[in-house]
């Protein structure tokens, strides 16, 4: 949400749309200028996992079908592709050092292959990290951080507590890792909580982790210390 109450929402037709407080919506980010198209079955696009940069000046959007990671300037209303992954990207989030972390849910190049990994567990989910270079661009080859997961989905980078939380959707669990933000490493993998089909997540102001569950049509509030 922008400071004036405007919502920025993923939209297959346009990439992103903005919705004002009256409910009026219009395209945002000028995705068409960089060749964005959604014309199934020939061309499938799947914008997903919309997140602000730490300084709130940009929006990062993953594409779960094409594998593109988009960075949109809020002030200029312009978008560029900062990385094109070989498989779909579920969620992309920038840390305070400028590096972008992202999840590959499965080795999909299409909608049908993505839903194959939702129909049955396939352990090819991965967390990657895309380092920021001194010239302000991103390294062209992402670093593999954690692999072997059953549909890696939404995550949250908790730099204050040096923790990284991740939804492993097809394992019905939320994982917790120790985070070394300087080294870009995740260690001490643990199950924080078991809930059905965990998806996107956000740490609430009360210190509880809010996790969406599409299967149960609920939002779970999880104590990050106890997992309850």
Regions found by a protein language model. Give the residues of each.
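Beta-propeller blade signature
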Residues: 119-133
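A short loop-to-beta-strand structural motif that recurs across blades of beta-propeller domains
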Residues: 15-17, 68-70, 125-128, 173-175, ...
């Amino acid at each position: 949400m922008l400071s004036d109450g405007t919502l920025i929402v993923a939209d297959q037709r346009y990439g992103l749309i903005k919705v004002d407080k009256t409910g009026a919506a219009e395209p945002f980010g000028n995705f068409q200028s960089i060749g964005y198209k959604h014309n199934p079955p020939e061309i499938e696009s799947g914008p997903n996992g919309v997140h602000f940069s730490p300084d709130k000046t940009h929006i990062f959007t993953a594409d779960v079908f094409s594998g593109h990671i988009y960075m949109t300037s809020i002030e200029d209303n312009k978008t560029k592709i900062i990385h094109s992954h070989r498989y779909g990207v579920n969620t992309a989030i920038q840390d305070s050092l400028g590096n972008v972390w992202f999840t590959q849910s499965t080795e999909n190049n299409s909608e049908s292959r993505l839903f194959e990994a939702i129909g049955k567990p396939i352990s090819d989910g991965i967390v990657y990290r895309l380092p920021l270079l001194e010239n302000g661009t991103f390294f062209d080859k992402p670093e593999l951080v954690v692999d072997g997961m059953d549909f890696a989905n939404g995550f949250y980078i908790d730099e204050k507590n040096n923790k990284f939380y991740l939804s492993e959707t097809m394992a019905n669990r939320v994982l917790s890792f120790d985070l070394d933000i300087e080294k870009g490493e995740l260690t001490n993998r643990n199950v924080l909580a078991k809930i059905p089909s965990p998806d996107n997540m956000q740490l609430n102001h009360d210190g509880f982790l809010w996790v969406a569950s599409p299967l149960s049509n609920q939002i779970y509030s999880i104590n990050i210390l106890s997992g309850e």
